[in-house]
Amino acid sequence: MLPQVWAAAERAVAAGMHLCLSTGRPAFGRALGYAQRLDPGGWHIFQNGASIVNVATGDSVSEALPTELLLELVATSRRLGRILEVYTDSEYATESGDRRAVEHAAMLGVPYVQRDVLSLSTQVVRAQWVVPLDGQAAVMAEPHPGMSLHPAGSPGMPDTMFISVTRAGVSKGGAVRRVAARYGLETDQAMMVGDGENDVSAMRVVGYPVAMGNAEPAAVAASRFQVGHVNDGGLAEALELAMVLP
């Protein structure tokens, strides 16, 4: 992130605000580092709301992906040869040797390790399809009973679509409610800054939804405020806005 964003975050925390990272990424690698720097004593939302972790204590109020649903996904992945990643709060696994799987590990900031996706020893909270951009529609059209799909792209891998799979009903919006309750706040006192389709559920439950200048149309439509592009320090602008709103 840009230096002015970190400076604005420090001012916000010093003013008594709770800052919460809300991301599709897991609570390890680069995303964990961002959360720890953003608000080192706070609760943060990872994995599209499936993983809610206090980065100071390691406590978790996460949502499990039921085993029977996981087994269905694994069977489909092995049958089609499609990249599937499986996540707990603190680690992940993939059986794929495809270059997208390798590149994604680097983007997450963790070593690439090929391993049995059913070998994880703690509670699974999410799976993720990793597909070419032109493969998104087919995956989204497939039946996923009992599950919610959360598609998102990344400028770090512009030719790839990441489709998170959680238990049905899990969303960033639900996670925002749970984090707000941890702080004794109502969601109408909260701000959500978003730019993607997977941010919309959270933007709809807060009192101050903000769209980045690079936001997708769905995020813009869900917003009350707009700030600059992420590459131009728009997040710092949003944090400054938060400090002057009633």
Listing of model-derived features with the role each one plays in the protein:
Residues 10-14, 78, 143, 204, ...:
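Anion (oxyanion) recognition and catalysis
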Residues 3-104:
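Active-site phosphate-binding/coordination module
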Residues 30-32, 55-56, 96, 139, ...:
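Short glycine-/acidic-enriched loop or helix-start segments at secondary-structure transitions
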Residues 49, 133-134, 153, 213-217:
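Short, polar loop motifs at secondary-structure junctions
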Residues 80-83, 87-193, 197-205:
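Conserved acidic, metal-coordinating active-site core of Asp-based
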Residues 2, 165-246:
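Mg2+-dependent phosphoryl-transfer enzymes with acidic/Ser/Thr/Gly-rich catalytic loops
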Residues 38-40, 48, 56, 143-146, ...:
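Short, structured coil segments at secondary-structure junctions
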